[in-house]
């Protein structure tokens, strides 16, 4: 098992490269996301877009392997399909979004413990489904068939009988960063506990 980190987005709403944007401690947003994932002691593979040199340089510094998705501009579905095609030997993979730096490592460990080849595991915070989502190898063909900007929602809906809910008290599973204000709002709401 390992974590597939989707880091190939364009950051259009952020207005700059959000993955290398500095958090309050001076580290990059992506570094925070990766720190929590690394704490689970599971393999990581980041999916990046061609020419995203600032992100690949950061991944090199952090010693995180990555794969360049040649069709990343097509959207998240294309990046996810490409990433899954690179980790077909994993019994299950956690699909993590690079712009979600507030998830507790304990939540990630609990998700990992429940993963399996035949199931999907998703965190829920107060009845709202969050990220990351773990997919067993059974679902890799469906994930590899995705394209465009459609993420894994269709797979989740089609195989809802295989979904294992993990209720968590971790609002970070819902908090992504799309704009600079998202970082400020998360701090105001006390979500930034993982930024120590």
Set out the residue ranges of the language-model regions.
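Glycine-rich phosphate-binding loop of ATP-grasp-fold ATP-dependent ligases
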Residues: 129-131, 173-174
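Nucleotide phosphate-binding site architecture
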Residues: 11, 21, 140-141, 184
